[in-house]
Amino acid sequence: MSSKHIAAVVMALAIGSVAPASAQTPADDSARRAAELAAERDKKAEELAPSKPSLVERALHWYDSNGAKLQWRAFRFAMGGFTGGAGLGYGVAIAEQGMGSPVVDPDQPNRIDGEFLAARTIRGYQRIAAKMHVLNLGGLPVDVSVRWQDDQLMQEDFYGFGPGSTEAGRSNYRLDSSEYGADFTWRPASPFTIGGELSYLTPLIGEGTDTRYPTTQSIYDVEDVPGLSDLPSFVRTGASLAFDWRDSDSHPRRGGYYRVAAAQTSGVNDASYDFRRLDIAAQQIVPLGNRYRRLNLQAAAALTDSSGVNDVPFFYQPSLGGLRTLRGFSESRFRDRHAAWARAEYQWEAWWALDAAFFVDAGQVASRLSEFTLHDVEVTYGVGFRMHANERVVAGLDIAVSREGVVPILGFRYGF
């Protein structure tokens, strides 16, 4: 085949291969491009569309929006606010805000709020309480309230006094008490509050109902445990000063809280149990880069003092142990005239509704201030998990370790 024939064949093949491409018009290119852009827009819209909240998310949102109250009209479920050793509580509360007013206004002068509670626990503890508040008295930043509370605490623990008390000394007693009181709170400036109280108390000690342990009366002498019998009624007067700049009192992520309170408790027609008490507490939240990681630092001390030969009733003496102080020990594990404790927690948001924490607690009790020594400091440590809504903690599980073993503490932040 000649070179001319070869050139003709190559040219024909080239023209044939180009012909289909040249057959695509500009209109076809525009339509194809428009379809591709539409598909990309649909895909992006699907990615940006909000996901449907889960059942847990909807429940926690409801918990936040409804003030953490299982409520129907003025009635709501309540757990009673008992101490950690009381067991699971259940009951009903009636709360009415702005009584006689069609609108609940937090700034309304002389606004009247009322509350009533009746609760019980699975261990037989009982509580009945009523409160009446008058807010913004006379249009001033002053609140006053009157209250009444009747308690039957059936299985309170007592291990003896001092840091040397042992688990073998565990006993239980019953504390029945009625309290009538009046309080006032003055808010001179936004973070500051100044408070005062006047209370009348009628405590009565009996034998505990926890059959797992002996009663306090059966293994301790009345002479060695002040207040175990022959108690008078008491009058308590007190004053407090607090500074609170936390962003939330139930689930703080930044800020601090500092409080000092002093009280005088005097027996009615019997001065043998008169005493004074000073309480100091501080909390500081330190954000670590953002609101999802933080340090929660706390410290507190409770100091009592009596004149002459007077004794402080044992059940009014400060104690350590349980969820609020030393989590690696049982409730009220250590008791004496003075107590101090501190805590550090590293908290982070493991999930939007779940915080996790590593913590260390340390504390000590002593009969005299001079007896506070590092040698007697008790230390516990562990890990905790707290289910929460945006502003409120719902429940928590802390697993704490101490020299007496591992203590799991399940707590619900709910109630009156």
Q: Where are the regions that the model predicts?
A:
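Outer-membrane beta-barrel initiation region
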Residues: 24-145, 220-252, 323, 336-340, ...
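Transmembrane beta-barrel strands of outer-membrane/channel proteins
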Residues: 77-81, 114-120, 144-154, 159-162, ...
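Residues on the lipid-exposed face of transmembrane beta-strands in outer-membrane beta-barrel proteins
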Residues: 92-96, 130-134, 182-186, 198, ...
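Sequence/structural signature of outer-membrane beta-barrel proteins
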Residues: 97-101, 119-125, 137, 151-155, ...
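Extracellular loop and loop/strand-boundary signature of outer-membrane beta-barrel proteins
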Residues: 115-118, 165-170, 222-228, 264-270, ...
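Outer-membrane beta-barrel translocator domains and adjoining extracellular loop/strand segments
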Residues: 127-132, 156-164, 206-215, 252-254, ...
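Outer-membrane beta-barrel translocator/channel fold
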Residues: 144-186, 300-320, 395-399, 404-414
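Extracytoplasmic gating/loop element in the C-terminal half of outer-membrane beta-barrel translocons
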Residues: 287-362, 367
